[in-house]
Regions:
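A short beta-strand micro-motif
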Residues: 2-10
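A short, exposed loop/beta-hairpin motif centered on an aromatic-Gly-Thr core
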Residues: 9-14, 27-38, 128
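Short, conserved catalytic or adaptor-binding loops enriched in Gly and charged residues
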Residues: 24-26, 58-59, 165-170
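Short, mixed-charge low-complexity intrinsically disordered segments
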Residues: 31-55
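Eukaryotic low-complexity, Ser/Thr/Pro- and acidic-rich intrinsically disordered regulatory regions
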Residues: 48-55, 59-62, 97, 199-201
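RNase H-like nuclease fold core
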Residues: 58-112, 124
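RNase H catalytic domain
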Residues: 72-78, 118-190, 194, 199
Length: 201
């Protein structure tokens, strides 16, 4: 389900169908509107506040290490990369990025980078003594493989599930949060930029 928030138009508000949204902006010069997957995001848009900023702030107050992860891939360079933007409970930030060319994973393109982003985030968390981590990602397989919602058949998914099984006991809590890709979420944009820069090195 989508929620349509009209900030500037004939009628201001949140609508649950596209026809309702169209009626609220039809004939209005330069309307401002946007669709969202949750009502909370739509409400923040109308208020002019950052929804994901507020969500992350709640995570940090709850003691989570927050990790935004992303991956990239270059067919021409035959390599993939990952970027991780970490936000510590005390507000400090840490960035991780890297590039790999594992032949057995290349055919999965940027998915390999997404996977290694999570792996590196968990490794960093373990090495630095964090027991609670929330991982934000835009590829749904990262959470679904470990819950067996998706079957792990590919080499990258099998490796990922095996790694997960080995590191999970080191944590008290690991949460996953899918975010929409290419939606101007500032934290995710940092991870995306890190991955792309690593690929270019």
């Amino acid at each position: 389900m989508k929620y349509y928030a009209v900030k500037v138009g004939k009628k201001i508000g949140i609508f649950e169908t596209w026809p309702e949204c169209q009626a609220a902006i039809a004939g209005f010069k330069k309307p401002v509107f946007k669709s969202f997957l949750t009502k909370a995001e739509a409400e923040c848009f109308l208020k002019g506040t950052d929804y994901w900023q507020s969500v992350v702030e709640k995570d940090l107050k709850a003691g989570y290490l927050v990790a935004f992860t992303d991956g990239s891939f270059s067919k021409e360079l035959t390599k993939f990369s990952y970027g991780v933007h970490l936000i510590l409970p005390n507000g400090q930030k840490q960035n991780i990025s890297g590039c790999r060319a594992d032949r057995e994973f290349l055919k999965t393109a940027n998915v390999a980078g997404e996977v290694f982003g999570v792996i590196e985030a968990l490794k960093w968390a373990k090495e630095n003594g964090f027991k609670k981590i929330k991982i934000y990602h835009d590829y749904q397989g990262l959470a679904r493989w470990i819950t067996s919602e998706w079957s792990a058949y590919s080499k990258i998914s099998l490796m990922y599930v095996e790694f997960w099984a080995s590191i999970k006991p080191e944590f008290n809590e690991i949460k996953f949060q899918k975010v929409p890709s290419h939606s101007n979420i500032s934290f995710n944009d940092v991870a995306d930029k890190l991955a792309k820069e690593a690929l270019a090195k």
